[in-house]
């Protein structure tokens, strides 16, 4: 039996190294695609971000062809997602549960799911909302990244609460429905 030539060994070593590097790069990109921080950032450390142009409201076109002013006359909870982000389904469900609880209790706040991928169609987003059993959740496509830039949101699965004055009072990754409700109450709901 003959052993492989030195050239064949080097070729195999290069191929293995290239595959390992490709796997590491793929893993890094996959992990960074969805936020993984499950702790809420304290308002004191993050509330100041995204407030430079906070006094002026943006009118957002919703998927149901209505509009919503953000910030409006009541606190707003905005959840940034993409249909392709598996982790985002849980955060969107939490947003919908918080919206239903507020509605049932007669409390006033705006709830908005913001799709960060401008290439996803209205139909795809509606199917996603149906899939997570939140078909009534108000949603929009962040065309031109207007909302994500204004509020400095770079990661999927990020939820922010914006007070009526325009100040971001809460920022977290995939918070629970209770955490969203508490943050909205602190913002004046």
UniProtKB/Swiss-Prot annotation:
In terms of InterPro entries, this protein maps to: TAT_signal (IPR006311), Thioredoxin-like_fold (IPR012336), Thioredoxin-like_sf (IPR036249), Thioredoxin_domain (IPR013766)
Gene Ontology biological-process entries: response to mercury ion
Name residues in a coiled coil.
Answer: none
Main location, first listed in the record? secreted
UniProt keywords, alphabetically: Mercuric resistance, Mercury, Secreted, Signal
Q: Which residues form the Thioredoxin domain?
A: 38-189
How is this chain modified after translation? Predicted to be exported by the Tat system. The position of the signal peptide cleavage has not been experimentally proven.
Annotated transmembrane regions: none
Q: Where in the cell is it found?
A: Secreted
Concerning Pfam families, the annotation shows: Thioredoxin_8
The task this protein performs is described as: Probable mercury binding protein.
Protein name, per record: Mercury resistance operon ORF3
**What organism does the UniProt record list as the source?**
Streptomyces lividans
């Amino acid at each position: 039996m003959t052993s492989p030539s030195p050239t064949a060994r080097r070729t195999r070593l290069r191929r293995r190294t290239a595959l390992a590097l490709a796997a590491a790069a793929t893993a890094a990109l996959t992990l960074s695609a969805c936020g993984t921080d499950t702790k809420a950032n304290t308002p004191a450390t993050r509330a100041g971000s995204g407030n430079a142009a906070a006094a002026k409201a943006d009118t957002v076109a919703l998927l149901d062809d209505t509009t919503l002013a953000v910030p409006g006359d009541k606190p707003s909870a905005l959840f940034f997602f993409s249909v392709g982000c598996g982790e985002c389904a849980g955060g969107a469900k939490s947003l919908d549960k918080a919206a239903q609880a507020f509605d049932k209790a007669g409390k006033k706040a705006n709830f908005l799911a913001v799709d960060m991928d401008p290439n996803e169609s209205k139909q795809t987003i509606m199917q996603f909302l149906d899939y997570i059993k939140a078909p009534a959740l108000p949603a929009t496509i962040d065309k031109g990244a207007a909302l994500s830039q204004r509020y400095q949101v770079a990661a999927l699965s990020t939820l922010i609460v914006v007070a009526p004055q325009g100040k971001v009072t809460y920022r977290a990754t995939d918070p629970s429905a209770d955490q969203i409700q508490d943050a909205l109450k602190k913002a004046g709901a």
